[in-house]
């Protein structure tokens, strides 16, 4: 039987009564964001909304973005990345568990010097994929062109944010490349590995 989202006690400033709110709401109030699922439009919009709201509330207080994601859709992931670059607060990205595909793209998008992986975390990068098998010939060509544009965007971001040469990033994106936290640090995807 699923337990649902745990509830925690919370007292609003200046109030005597305690109310019970879900744990994520409580953590959002502390500027802690979580991506613990596949990247798709709904979670992307929620995280974008939270980042914008929290930056309006206090543009000088950092955001902490925890990632444990198998990846997901490219455009919703790029939207999260773009928002991270747009909002005034610095965004710390923290990988726990797995940051694969779009999860690693979001991880690398954190403020440089403030990207961290837990010691047993795994990171995976690869090129974007599409479902060509159902497309008509004309759609196939258009989708291939769009995919090339997206690959170019993703490659440029990894080059810019990791400091690796274009040829290294391009070669790595050709296949699934899994990394330990230390390897991700060497690769420039994270800046620090948390100590045990």
Curated annotation (Swiss-Prot):
UniProt GO molecular function: ATP-dependent peptidase activity; ATPase binding; serine-type endopeptidase activity
Q: Which GO terms describe its cellular component?
A: chloroplast stroma; endopeptidase Clp complex
Tell me what reaction this enzyme catalyses. Hydrolysis of proteins to small peptides in the presence of ATP and magnesium. alpha-casein is the usual test substrate. In the absence of ATP, only oligopeptides shorter than five residues are hydrolyzed (such as succinyl-Leu-Tyr-|-NHMec, and Leu-Tyr-Leu-|-Tyr-Trp, in which cleavage of the -Tyr-|-Leu- and -Tyr-|-Trp bonds also occurs)
Alphabetical list of CDD domains matching this protein: S14_ClpP_2
Q: Does the keyword Coiled coil apply?
A: no
Compartments where found: Plastid, Chloroplast stroma
List of catalytic residues: 101, 126
- InterPro entries associated with the record: ClpP, ClpP/crotonase-like_dom_sf, ClpP/TepA, ClpP_His_AS, ClpP_Ser_AS
Instruction: Tell me where on the tree of life, at the top rank, the source sits.
Output: Eukaryota
Q: Which Pfam families match?
A: CLP_protease
Which Gene3D superfamilies does the record cross-reference, listed alphabetically? 2-enoyl-CoA Hydratase, Chain A, domain 1 (3.90.226.10)
Q: What is its EC number?
A: 3.4.21.92
Any one GO BP annotation for this protein: protein quality control for misfolded or incompletely synthesized proteins
Protein family (similarity comment): Belongs to the peptidase S14 family.
PANTHER family linked to this entry: ATP-DEPENDENT CLP PROTEASE PROTEOLYTIC SUBUNIT (PTHR10381), CHLOROPLASTIC ATP-DEPENDENT CLP PROTEASE PROTEOLYTIC SUBUNIT 1 (PTHR10381:SF15)
Reported function: Cleaves peptides in various proteins in a process that requires ATP hydrolysis. Has a chymotrypsin-like activity. Plays a major role in the degradation of misfolded proteins.
HAMAP family, alphabetized? ClpP
Assembly with partners or alone: Component of the chloroplastic Clp protease core complex.
Q: What is this protein called?
A: ATP-dependent Clp protease proteolytic subunit
Q: Which organism is it from?
A: Vitis vinifera (Grape)
| Source lineage | Eukaryota, Viridiplantae, Streptophyta, Embryophyta, Tracheophyta
């Amino acid at each position: 039987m699923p337990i649902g989202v745990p509830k925690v006690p919370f007292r609003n400033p200046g109030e005597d009564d305690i109310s019970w709110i879900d744990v994520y709401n409580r953590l959002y109030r502390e500027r802690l964001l979580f991506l613990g699922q596949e990247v798709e439009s709904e979670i992307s919009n929620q995280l974008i909304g939270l980042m914008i709201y929290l930056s309006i509330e206090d543009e000088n207080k950092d955001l902490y973005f925890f990632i444990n994601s198998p990846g997901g859709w490219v455009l919703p992931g790029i939207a999260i990345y773009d928002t991270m670059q747009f909002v005034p607060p610095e965004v710390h990205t923290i990988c726990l568990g797995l940051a694969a595909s779009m999860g690693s793209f979001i991880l690398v998008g954190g403020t440089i010097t403030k990207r961290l992986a837990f010691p047993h975390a795994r990171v995976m990068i690869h090129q974007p994929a599409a479902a060509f098998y159902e497309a008509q010939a004309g759609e196939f060509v258009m989708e291939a062109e769009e995919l090339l544009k997206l690959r170019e965007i993703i490659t440029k971001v990894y080059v810019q944010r990791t400091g690796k040469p274009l040829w290294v990033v391009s070669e790595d994106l050709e296949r699934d490349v899994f990394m330990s936290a230390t390897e991700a640090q060497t690769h420039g995807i994270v800046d620090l590995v948390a100590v045990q």
